[in-house]
Amino acid sequence: MTEMLKGIAASDGVAVAKAYLLVQPDLSFETVTVEDTSAEEARLDAALAASQDELSVIREKAVESLGEEAAAVFDAHLMVLADPEMTGQIKETIRAKQVNAEAALTEVTDMFIAIFEGMEDNPYMQERAADIRDVTKRVLANLLGKKLPNPATINEESIVVAHDLTPSDTAQLNKKYVKAFVTNIGGRTSHSAIMARTLEIAAVLGTNNITELVKDGDILAVSGITGEVVINPTEEQIAEFKAAGEAYAKQKAEWALLKDAQTVTADGKHFELAANIGTPKDVEGVNDNGAEAVGLYRTEFLYMDSQDFPTEDDQYEAYKAVLEGMNGKPVVVRTMDIGGDKELPYFDLPKEMNPFLGYRALRISISETGNQMFRTQLRALLRASVHGKLRIMFPMVALLTEFRTAKGILEEEKAKLVAEGVAVADDIEVGIMIEIPAAAMLADQFAKEVDFFSIGTNDLIQYTMAADRMNEQVSYLYQPYNPSILRLINNVIKAAHAEGKWAGMCGEMAGDQTAVPLLVGMGLDEFSMSATSVLRTRSLMKKLDTAKMEEYANRALTECSTMEEVLELSKEYVNVD
């Protein structure tokens, strides 16, 4: 029987293939009284070690297929496994209650999950609850001798169907065989959606009940462009979906022809299309997709991939590799953004109720605790500056005094290197990320002292709307097109231009095809996105008329009071298919 569902279009693409139902094993168990608690602790240690080995392998595969940024979610999982407080409590429960490891594990992790989930105003802690739940499932499976589903074993063209896909599930998808996936829950900003876009696999999320309607082997037709899913489609529907897939493939082939083209609008105005990276390995993808710059190099992955603080020489080699790999094209390097959801096992940070609003990023760098680490990074960057066109960017800046302090440290290290006879480029631009509303509101003052702005919309939207984009209960508040967000962005761009400076954007919004026309109208100079979005965005920009987009942006800023009104207005101005 044919049935149609509508979900959230999370990753572009069209596919028709057999359904592969990702079924979770039965992890139920009985609580058993044990006499030999030492043996039970040994069982727990073995399960923890096996889980750690599995996650390490999955992380390595994720780095290869998805890049360092997407793979970083597994660092949080590995940290849960290594958390001495939690593992210590599990062992204490085994000894005190003389119960089997399964019962102790579940009792302790359920307690942690309940505590973290109870912090409803703290999205960071709620994300930790999700990490603990995912890791607990893996450890429990190892204790019970059960195998978790392994999507890596799929060896024929399939569409994966699941209630939800964990990051470890998504990281194991082989896009040679997995043509799409569909889930009951999730949205465009979930980890699985972001990974799907990186892998270029079609995805439709949030269908509510796809797992109740589909059996293994059913034929599915999926459009990650429209969000439509058809179960056991008719021959006519299959033909329609295949035609849509061919049209999309043809469109992608046309985009590929733009690799070496200039990014200019229909009326000849140039905009810079850049790409975001996490490691030197990512530069190949930047060049393959015709990006004109690296608009965001997230250097924290250098720290997260090390067992200790990376040395000045190690960092120098990494920065040099990126600058040389870009062959003179600009590279914006963000200084370390540690803290929040990025912890280092070798760097003790204080436990905080809300780390996203606490001691992180530049706040650590300019503090006494992080000062030497910051100076080491700046020296490495300054030494590497002679190998390309370096731009340095400070993250999480709220106050002008923070920028002045950071720039002062940079100047001190530059003077030391010059005194040592080390060559340093004399044309390094220094800017800040605009991700805190306070900085966006005071952009006119910052613009007098910085060389550029890069707007980090992911955090700017969260902080402005007071809504975690990963929290489904408040995800409706994560509104890139809300007029309040658009006005903040416009304020930053205009402030930069008033001082003869440039403004870029490195959040997801920069590559959002709905947002690009608005941002062109506002005069954003540089758009930095995932490398796989560059060619598509270049194609879109070639069809836009700047004057028309300026009129559209002006009306959106002055006439609209809701996101829905902005999106409705876009229909009058944007028709580039």
UniProtKB/Swiss-Prot annotation:
One cellular component term from this protein's GO annotations in UniProt: cytoplasm
Record Pfam families: PEP-utilisers_N, PEP-utilizers, PEP-utilizers_C
SUPFAM superfamilies assigned: Enzyme I of the PEP:sugar phosphotransferase system HPr-binding (sub)domain, Phosphoenolpyruvate/pyruvate domain, Phosphohistidine domain
Required cofactor(s): Mg(2+)
Gene3D superfamilies registered for this protein in UniProt: Phosphoenolpyruvate-binding domains, Phosphohistidine domain, PtsI, HPr-binding domain
Active site, UniProt feature: H191, C506
Keyword Cytoplasm: yes
Binding site for phosphoenolpyruvate: R298, R334, N458, D459, R469
Kinase as UniProt keyword: yes
Keyword annotations: Cytoplasm, Kinase, Magnesium, Metal-binding, Phosphotransferase system, Sugar transport, Transferase, Transport
Catalytic activity: L-histidyl-[protein] + phosphoenolpyruvate = N(pros)-phospho-L-histidyl-[protein] + pyruvate
Other notes: The reaction takes place in three steps, mediated by a phosphocarrier histidine residue located on the surface of the central domain. The two first partial reactions are catalyzed at an active site located on the N-terminal domain, and the third partial reaction is catalyzed at an active site located on the C-terminal domain. For catalytic turnover, the central domain swivels from the concave surface of the N-terminal domain to that of the C-terminal domain.
Written domain comment of the UniProt record: The N-terminal domain contains the HPr binding site, the central domain the pyrophosphate/phosphate carrier histidine, and the C-terminal domain the pyruvate binding site.
Summary of subunit composition and partner proteins: Homodimer.
Family: Belongs to the PEP-utilizing enzyme family.
Protein name: Phosphoenolpyruvate-protein phosphotransferase
Organism of origin: Streptococcus salivarius
